[in-house]
Amino acid sequence: KFVAGADTGKKVAVIGGGPAGMAGAYQLRRKGHAVTVFDDNKHLGGMMYYGIPGYRIPRDKLESENQRIVDMGVELRMETRIGRDVSVADLESEYDAILWAVGCQSGRGLFVEGWEETSNCVSGVAFLKAFNEGRMKVTADKVVCVGGGDTSIDVVSVARRLGHIEHTNPTDRPELVVRDGYVAHDAAVT
C-alpha cells in the first residue's frame, strides 16, 4: 500500500490520467500535496488503456495499479476536458500548480496526399482506441496496415482477432528480419 506524505496545504491539478499523470500524482501525494487528476476519458491509464489492446496489458492489473495511487487520496475528475468543462483560468485560481501530462494521443497519418479525406482510412492510434472503447466498426472485408512499429503490430493483431486478416506470408514477420543485431520491429532496416 502506498502512503501519502504529511499534508503541505498545497493543491496540484494533474491534467491527464495516463502513465505520466499518475506517476506525477503518486510523487505529489508522497510529498503531501493534495492532487486532483483531470482526464477526458472514462478510465485512467491513457494510451496504456486506450492505445494498447487489453490482451497485451491486462485491464485488471492496470486498474489495480492506478487504484493504489488513487487510494493515497487522489481526487479524480474523469470525463472532464480542460477548456470545455473547466477553464485554465479556473484551474489557476483554485490550484497552486498544474502538471500537464496530456501524453501523445494523435498518431501519425500516411504520407499520402488526401488520405485524411478517405472515409475508410484511419490512423493506427484511432483504430486501437475505437477497439479498446468497444466502438469498433470495421465495414471492410480486409484491413491494410502501413508500418511495422509497435502500433502497427497491435493494429494487425486486433484486425486478425476480428477476422479481417486471412493470410499472412510466413516470412512477413518482424522477428524473422534481422540486420546488424536488430529485428525489424526494433529498428528501421534500410
Residue spans of the language-model regions?
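Fe-S ferredoxin-like electron-transfer domains
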Residues: 1-36, 40-43, 48-55, 66, ...
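Rossmann-like dinucleotide/flavin-binding elements
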Residues: 11-38, 77-87, 92, 106-108, ...
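Conserved hydrophobic/aromatic pocket- or pore-lining residues that grip, position, or stack substrates
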Residues: 39, 69, 99, 121, ...
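N-terminal Rossmann-like dinucleotide/flavin-binding domain of flavoprotein oxidoreductases
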Residues: 47-96, 111
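Short, structured coil segments at secondary-structure junctions
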Residues: 72, 116-117, 185
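Flavin (primarily FAD) binding-site architecture
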Residues: 101-117, 121-122
